[in-house]
């Protein structure tokens, strides 16, 4: 349950995906808590990446935004593996087996049958999601 900035109570179902030792994930979880928002945390390291969730993220956010090419996991890949990532299917296959390569956090904002996916810490967008629900 979240308290929106206009003082009304909102009840979005928030699932935050990431890894617990990631600084941006820690910051994001603290920010949600400061807003009075409970959320479910899905740990990539322990729980993996659900294929249906990954498909939704790719459809909404795009594989290019999800794939963290600046992170350590990407830089440690050999050049052949990096070069093989050229479309949604190849990127999704890599993200399924190496979830640390996904830009974090990924958040699903749900209200009824509506869902919105955001990638990375984006306070202005998050405030809109809290105020208006997924249909921002």
What is each stretch, according to the model?
Residues 3, 27-30, 66-67, 78:
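Short, flexible segments with low predicted structural confidence
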Residues 10-35, 39-47:
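Local sequence-structure signature of Cys/Sec-based thiol-disulfide redox active-site neighborhoods
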